[in-house]
Amino acid sequence: MAQQDVKPTRSELINLKKKIKLSESGHKLLKMKRDGLILEFFKILNEARNVRTELDAAFAKSTEKINLASAVNGMVAVRSTAFTAKESPEIQLSGHNIMGVVVPKISSTGVRKSLYERGYGIIGTNSYIDETADAYEDLVEKIITAAELETTMKRLLDEIEKTKRRVNALEFKVIPELIDTMKYIRFMLEEMERENTFRLKRVKARMRD
């Protein structure tokens, strides 16, 4: 707010005081929101790290199982078995709110399957195929969980940065400028009052003369 654009009046001084009070209140609320978002972010970050560790282990296990199944049954047989599934997994996307930020909720159906649902039956296959299917179903579930957590972290981080910018703008620009303008108006009002007092004294002096 440029000081030269402000009229040095008492009503303007009152308006400025209200703006400062409102800005300070908004600044306090935004700081609380920022701190709350940071706490939520680190809570989810810890969970995401655990899931990422589980995901890496699940990937290593599924790779080991498919290599073993391929060595015993042949890669062609393993691939053929994979295409016999009667139904594909379904992913459902929804959202939920964390301190004003809408983050994804990813749920799935049909990832875990029974032998019947897998479609390849028992005859002509062995436990290596079953263990490979189990391992990859577990891997898919871990991928879904990791995707939800990592997307949530990204959205929270974006909101944290946005809130930090607003906090800093209020703290280092808006509020200081309002306070400086208020001081300027007070100074101008005091000067005007001194001038008026001086004029009044001169008028009284002339009247006495």
From Swiss-Prot:
It comes from Methanosarcina mazei (strain ATCC BAA-159 / DSM 3647 / Goe1 / Go1 / JCM 11833 / OCM 88) (Methanosarcina frisia). Has multiple subunits, A(3), B(3), C, D, E, F, G, I and K(x); there may be a few other subunits as well. Component of the A-type ATP synthase that produces ATP from ADP in the presence of a proton gradient across the membrane. Optimum pH is 5.2 for ATP hydrolysis. It is a peripheral membrane protein. The keyword Lipid biosynthesis does not apply. This is A-type ATP synthase subunit D. Belongs to the V-ATPase D subunit family. Keywords: ATP synthesis, Cell membrane, Hydrogen ion transport, Ion transport, Membrane, Transport. One of its GO terms (biological process) is proton motive force-driven plasma membrane ATP synthesis. It is found in: Cell membrane. Gene3D superfamilies: 1.10.287.3240. Pfam families: ATP-synt_D. One of its GO terms (molecular function) is ATP binding. It comes from the Archaea. One of its GO terms (cellular component) is plasma membrane. The keyword Transport applies. This organism has both a Na(+)-translocating F1F0 ATP synthase and this H(+)-translocating A1A0 ATP synthase.
